[in-house]
Structure formats: structure tokens, C-alpha cells
From Swiss-Prot:
Keywords: Cobalamin biosynthesis, Methyltransferase, S-adenosyl-L-methionine, Transferase. This is Cobalt-precorrin-5B C(1)-methyltransferase. Belongs to the CbiD family. The lineage of its organism: Archaea, Thermoproteota, Thermoprotei, Sulfolobales, Sulfolobaceae. The gene is cbiD. PANTHER family: COBALT-PRECORRIN-5B C(1)-METHYLTRANSFERASE. Pfam families: CbiD (PF01888). It is an enzyme of class 2 (transferase). One of its GO terms (molecular function) is cobalt-precorrin-5B C1-methyltransferase activity. Its EC number is 2.1.1.195. InterPro entries: CbiD, CbiD_sf. It comes from Saccharolobus islandicus (strain Y.N.15.51 / Yellowstone #2). One of its GO terms (biological process) is anaerobic cobalamin biosynthetic process. Pathway: Cofactor biosynthesis; adenosylcobalamin biosynthesis; cob(II)yrinate a,c-diamide from sirohydrochlorin (anaerobic route): step 6/10. It catalyses: Co-precorrin-5B + S-adenosyl-L-methionine = Co-precorrin-6A + S-adenosyl-L-homocysteine. Gene3D superfamilies: CbiD-like, CbiD-like domains.
Amino acid sequence: MIINSLKRFGITTGAAASAAAKAAVMGLLNREKRNTVVIPTPIGLRLEIPVEKVEIDSGIACAEVKKFSGDNPDILDGLVIRCCAKLNESNEIVIVGEKGVGKVTRSGLKATMGETAISPTVRDMVINAIREVTDKGIQITIEVPNGDIIAENTLNKMVGIVGGISILGTTGIETPVSDDDYLEHIKCELNVIRQSYDFVVIAPGNSAAKYASKLFDSNSIIKVGDRIGDSIKLASSVFRKVILAGLPAKLLKVYAGIFNTHYSQGDARLESLTHASVLAGLPYDVLTKITNALSVEEAFTYMTKEQRRKVMKIVAEKILSRIKSFNGDINFCVIIFDYDGESLSRVGC
């Protein structure tokens, strides 16, 4: 499919980088200047993405792809992702982030401290796209013109990524947020699930849905993005049991009473984590590290597994009490996963 035919959806920076990398390799090896390329995604969907420019020189080729954000109010919409390809002597694909791609300066993120902010999933996407063209060794350089300037208006600095944007994406597709049509889509999907199940599993994102699928039939799971509160309200009018399953960062917002977890609606993740950690009786030195962390992932590195379980049990219990106010006649359950997919807490299940 052509990505532009997905009227309200967009592509992630990772998908844009994968398309640019594939176009650059095709230019390098075949001297092709493609207007579009087709890339594989982690969810099995293949995307045909427009290519803005291909430049071919001796021993190197570069391609540019514009990020398309669909109906999302995204500051990265229209951003150019530029990839350059050249052969290397190995049989491996080496991916390097250059100007405009941020560097990781704190622990706790998916990328290792000191590396460029290109997620492991995106690295796999780029490799898979290139392997459709060649099995030769390739070096890919990813650049984002003005990425350092644009990054000043993102949340990157708050989580320890400096000097540019992050190249991210777990599916390659960017779903719309905060629009009534999206809620209608959720309502329709809930009705479909109800035909086969008397319960539903609400997962805010792709990782949560993936981890939840280890516990429940994947057809009983719905991904709702940031609209957690609205989705729970809709589900509670249709199902006898509603299960909220997610990762700590998203659910810590719900702990604070923020049911639309889009960044524009507020952020209390670390404050919530600190509050729950105090209630859990964590030592003062650990609390100090948590309050000074730049992300929940970093804060988790300062806690033992048992401490994480104790804190997340408090978080899950508070969330359960909040969502019960939506409909007291419904059986609600809250599951919080660790970042490796292990269940940290299950309350009401």
C-alpha cells in the first residue's frame, strides 16, 4: 500500500530511515534513483514510502525521505531523514548516527549510554530493508538536517538525549491521537472483540500489547494509544471484565489521575514513581536517585527487582481504585509489565 493512502496514519522516524537506507543502497549498487521504496515492518505490513531525493557519487549514494505524521500534531512532521550508503569489507550492516541524531547520555534507555539514539527495533528494520537488496557489507550513515535545532522543542533533553532527535518506532506506523474519529475506531474494535470474548485487554502501546499476548489471546487485546480513560469507559459499557495492561511510564500517569497520556495533557511520571516509592518504604538513598532520574527507565536501574514489584503493586492498586469509579459493577484488573515483558504486578485479576 502507499503510505499516503492511510489518511489518518503516518510513518515513524524509524520507517523513514529504513526507506532512505534502502533507497540509498539501491542507488549505490544498481545506480537506481527510486521515487518510492517498499520496506518491511515488524508487524508484517509492507509500506511503500515516497523518496524525496537520491544522489549517487563514486562509492557512495544518499537518499532522503520526509517523515509523514498523518493527523498527529507532530513537530517532526515533514522532517527530512537522510541516509548515505557505502560498501564495507565485512558482510555486516553497520548503522551510524551522525549530525542531527541525538546521543544517549543517561542509562535506562533502550539505546546504550554513549551511543546514538537509534532504537534496536529501528536498527533491525534498517537491516531487514537492506537485506532485501543485498547480502553485502554496507555502512549506513543516518543524518537529520536541523535535527539538533528541532530536538530543542522535544522532550529528548529530559530523558538524557542531546544533540538531535531520536530515531524510533516499534511498528513503523504512527497512529493518530486525540481525535474523535480515533475513538470511533476504538468503539468499533471493542464491539468486534465483544463478539468472541466477555473481557477485553486494553494496552496503551505496541510493547504492552506484545507482552499481554503472552497471557491472553491476541484477538482479545486492543491498542488504544493515549486515550486510556476514554477506552476504559467505552469498554466498561460493553464487557463484564476490563483488563488494563501496560508498562510503568504510561501507567504512572494514570496513577496520578491523567487518563489521556499524551504529553500535551501533563506529565507526572517521576513524581508518581517517587510518591509510590515513599509509600513502599524504599531507602532514602534510592529515593534520592529516583527523584534525580531523567526517565522511569533510568529510575528502575536504581531499584532491585523486589523494590520494583513492591512499588508497582502500590501503583496498580491506586490505578484500580481510580478506574473502578468509571463503573462499579465491572470487574477491573490492572497488570504492569517490566521493560523486559515480565509481570511486575497484577491486581484485581
